[in-house]
């Protein structure tokens, strides 16, 4: 007992682990006691790589410590390694066993806090140092390097995937650009093809329009009236009435024999010229005076007959001749074209005008001669008198120029005061600027197309154009207007003078002239009454306008009986000139010149207005 207290004091003072009853072996065993709790403490700290060793270190020091506390009483270190000291003799141990245990427990309670203090300071330092060393070791371990390498691999993989994505996006953009370019090329190609198709369609339309115009011209040529009443007598220059001289073929001169009337009235377009040398030799003097009046044939052509030698042409062309020449003028009163006019079903306007003119002529001639046979005999005699024909031709040809200069009914013929060499043209408007090139293109494609057809096509195209398409041409119009204003600052637009006509020494406008002719026709209708005569053939108005006997063969005695002797003045009858000449040779050829002059003067006075009125009607309707 007295020996244990100094042991505890000694332990408390120096802490060296020396005991009186223990050998040096106990001191050597103390060092593992100091190491044991350190190992246990360190083992208590969880190590990631060695869990089995930590559990063994933490379990081993507890078992020998308990064995030391229970089985040995002389060991100074309560936490021994498990090997007990050699026991004392059993006499002392048996005597003081229970009391020693109590003292040991009490001393243990006093010693343990001091030991814990000593162990805690040393143990904490070593534990902290070891932890720092272990932390330093952890930074450079293979696992951390593997983790870092894994992270780097992941980053490399991500970068490679990002690069692939960028490359694919770039290639897609290139493909999209190529596709867009191809689409644009396709659209441009489609647009070009559409424009070509539109151009082809326009050309086809122009061709169809040209064909339609040609067909219309052919139809008009077939249905046109055979009696043409121009406003002016034709000049010596070839007139552009129609390019085909075949239009004169259907209207052939009536043969010498009346038996051939129906053959010539039932006309056909390719009707040949009558091949009768005797008849042609007989008719040749009759055709020469009327050659300047032929509108469809060339002048001085002996083959072509007198196609348009209607009474209206004779009267209108011979108006200004002086009354000094002798010989009557109604030489073609019964001209062949008078009957085909009604036979073809021409409108009532021209036919009625011709009938009115004939009524006026008969009204004036009836007052002078007294009977309808006398002027007809004058016609028959005048056909045979060649000096009279020469005088008539001279009187008709030379006053033609005077008539052309005196009468300006056609507005496009003579404008000497406004269309001189110093005439300033107006600046072109937008339509004219556009139509200039378009007209040239159409003429290059279709050189035979008529100007009126081209104008219709251009007008329809201009109307179908939008304002945006017309804008550059309006700008060109403004530029031309400014240029024209700079070039001609004092320019003023002077419109063409209105059409006038000199009638009885007075210059009348078109409206006044028509009104005058209308009143004259009405007065002539009211003042003229035909008394019925016995033995004459009475015909209705429908027979006069549309003679039904046109295609009927008539007996030769009947024709010879009715035509020369009892001819109705209002009845348009085709007269056979050969038969008339045969009958007229035996008649009296004595007529006073005064009567002829008076007859011609009265006829010319009324026929001038009437025939010009009829000619004006035809020109305006066309």
Swiss-Prot record:
UniProt GO cellular component terms: chromatin; cytoplasm; nucleoplasm; nucleus
Biased composition (Polar residues): 305-315
UniProt biased composition (Basic and acidic residues): 581-602
DNA-binding region: 424-492
Modified residues (Phosphoserine): 335, 382, 385-386, 613
Tissues expressing the protein: Expressed in exocrine cells and islets of Langerhans in the pancreas (at protein level). Expressed in the pancreas, placenta, kidney, brain, heart, lung, and liver. Expressed in adipose tissue, cervix, colon, esophagus, ovary, prostate, small intestine, spleen, testicle, thymus and thyroid.
GO biological process: anatomical structure morphogenesis; cell fate commitment; gamma-delta T cell differentiation; negative regulation of canonical Wnt signaling pathway; negative regulation of DNA-templated transcription; negative regulation of transcription by RNA polymerase II; positive regulation of brown fat cell differentiation; positive regulation of gamma-delta T cell differentiation
Principal location listed in the UniProt entry: nucleus
Region named Required for homodimerization: 84-344
Entry annotated with the keyword Repressor: yes
Pfam family, one: HMG_box
Molecular function GO terms recorded: DNA binding; DNA-binding transcription factor activity; DNA-binding transcription factor activity, RNA polymerase II-specific; DNA-binding transcription repressor activity; DNA-binding transcription repressor activity, RNA polymerase II-specific; identical protein binding; RNA polymerase II cis-regulatory region sequence-specific DNA binding; sequence-specific DNA binding
Keyword DNA-binding: yes
Disease connection: Autoantibodies against SOX13 are present in sera from patients with type 1 diabetes.
PANTHER family cross-referenced by the UniProt entry: FI18025P1, TRANSCRIPTION FACTOR SOX-13
Protein name, entry field: Transcription factor SOX-13
Biological source species: Homo sapiens
Lineage, opening ranks: Eukaryota, Metazoa, Chordata, Craniata, Vertebrata
